[in-house]
Amino acid sequence: MPISIPKGEKLMDLLSMKGKVTIVTGASGPRGMGIEAARGIAEMGGNVALTYAGRKEGGEKNAAALEKEYGIKAKAYKLDVANYESCCQLVKDVIADFGQIDAFVANAGKTADSGVLDGEISAFEEVIQTDLLGVAYCAKAVGHHFKERQTGSFVITASMSGHIANFPQEQTSYNVAKAGCIHMARSLANEWRDFARVNSISPGYIDTGLSDFVDKETQKLWHSMIPMGRDGDAKELKAAYVYFCSDASTYTTGSDLVIDGGYCAR
């Protein structure tokens, strides 16, 4: 059966996440795309399950802060996205605690700090395992639940690096993984067409702290190639996550939204 037209008429009703449960992976940091995606969902009244890899304190702190500020239910869970069984356990635990899963934001990821020739093969494999296979594991783990309920939205944090090859830093593994994420979203959108939507978001250079190790001269070079001349702030992405997770996008699937200050258009 085709995915149905939403009952809401007003925009705020379509964007509302009240009564819905969203998993957001990689949301334990003090700032970043994961916590901003979760905050956007919470602002619209949705309950959220946050995941962390090693920062338990950060995940639990973020969950508690969202509960206090927005009056929603939030809980933090440990997740190793590179392990399929861990992804399956997450889905089981969230269903047990919240009763259902309506949307899943596959945001957890890892950056690359070397190219193919100057880096270890283990480093290349780790990025692919986390950024590409980890997304596939999450999709498979939650996809059965979506199919059973005949509803769901799966949102992948891809990257503009899936569209272009970044310069001057060498990060082939990351570029390959994110390009795969974009095409995974398109492919899953077709595979899941009868019961769930799948889309991706491709951020550009966003000030999340993950690139703080890059020297200032390189960062200045990045800015010179961005038409808007600056990094993005993670809060400038949260509306996109809400759109894809909510009923406002029920006729949108297989799409990739580039939010990069114009970098890919230069």
Curated annotation (Swiss-Prot):
Q: Which Gene3D superfamilies does its entry note?
A: NAD(P)-binding Rossmann-like Domain
Is Transit peptide a UniProt keyword of this protein? no
Alphabetically, the GO molecular function entries are: oxidoreductase activity, acting on NAD(P)H, oxygen as acceptor; oxidoreductase activity, acting on the CH-OH group of donors, NAD or NADP as acceptor
Q: What is its EC number?
A: 1.1.1.138
Keyword Oxidoreductase tagged: yes
Summarize what gene deletion causes: Affects the ability to produce liamocins with a mannitol headgroup.
Q: Which residues bind NADP(+)?
A: N107, K140, Y174, K178, I206, T208
UniProt keyword annotations, A-Z: NADP, Oxidoreductase
Q: Which InterPro entries match?
A: NAD(P)-bd_dom_sf, SDR_fam
Q: What class of enzyme is it?
A: oxidoreductase
**What turns on expression?**
Expression is regulated by the cAMP-PKA and HOG1 signaling pathways via the transcriptional activator MSN2.
Biotech use, in short, is: Liamocins have high bioactivity against the pathogenic bacteria Streptococcus spp. and can be potential new specific inhibitors of oral streptococcal biofilms without affecting normal oral microflora. Liamocins are also able to inhibit human cancer cell lines such as breast cancer cell lines T47D and SK-BR3 or the cervical cancer cell line HeLa.
Active site, UniProt feature:
S159 (proton donor), Y174 (proton acceptor), K178 (lowers pka of active site tyr)
Query: What reaction does this enzyme carry out catalytically?
Result: D-mannitol + NADP(+) = D-fructose + NADPH + H(+)
Function text: Catalyzes the interconversion between D-mannitol and D-fructose. Plays a key role in liamocins biosynthesis by providing the mannitol moity that is linked to 3,5-dihydroxydecanoic acid (provided by the HR-PKS PKS1) via ester bond formation catalyzed by the esterase EST1.
Q: What is the protein's quaternary organization?
A: Homotetramer.
Q: Which family does it belong to?
A: Belongs to the short-chain dehydrogenases/reductases (SDR) family.
Name under which the protein is recorded: NADP-dependent mannitol dehydrogenase
Give the species this sequence originates from. Aureobasidium melanogenum
**Taxonomic classification:** Eukaryota, Fungi, Dikarya, Ascomycota, Pezizomycotina
